[in-house]
A protein has these predicted regions:
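Compact, glycine-rich, soluble single-domain proteins
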Residues: 1-129
Length: 129
């Protein structure tokens, strides 16, 4: 998937994986060695994350529910830069319904801020499910 910031005309990632099942959301990025620029993980149905058992820091963008008047773009509810391994924790973000986990520096590089609208759409080369 592609995560595109409509307000800033920037891509947060063009290789974003979707974790929509219980096991996929539980595992998240645990066990991975890192994320390349452009990669990410979209945790659906989540409004909090932890960094236990993680091997690398991440940026996290918490998204609200899709806005049908804005082509189902999701508003940014909260941003967290450089969440550190083992001690990083965001237990609950009011109004969030999903989380984008991204490489450190993505939030700064894209200028993403609370209130921006993020479109999540198939990326070039994605195979429909």
């Amino acid at each position: 998937m592609r995560a595109h910031n409509l307000n800033r005309a920037t891509d947060l990632g063009d290789r974003v994986e979707v974790a929509d099942g219980l096991w996929d959301r539980f595992m998240g990025l645990m066990g991975r060695r890192g994320l390349e620029v452009g990669a990410g993980l979209w945790l659906t149905g989540s409004n909090g994350i932890h960094m236990m058992f993680m091997r690398f820091a991440i940026d996290a963008v918490f998204l609200g529910r899709p806005d049908p008047e804005r082509d189902s773009a999701r508003p940014v509810m909260s941003v967290h830069r450089g969440l550190r391994t083992w001690i990083g924790l965001v237990p609950f973000v009011r109004g969030a319904s999903s989380v984008l986990e991204l490489p450190v520096g993505t939030i700064e590089r894209t200028g993403t801020a609370v209130g921006d609208l993020i479109a999540l759409e198939p990326a070039a080369g994605d195979v429909p499910a």
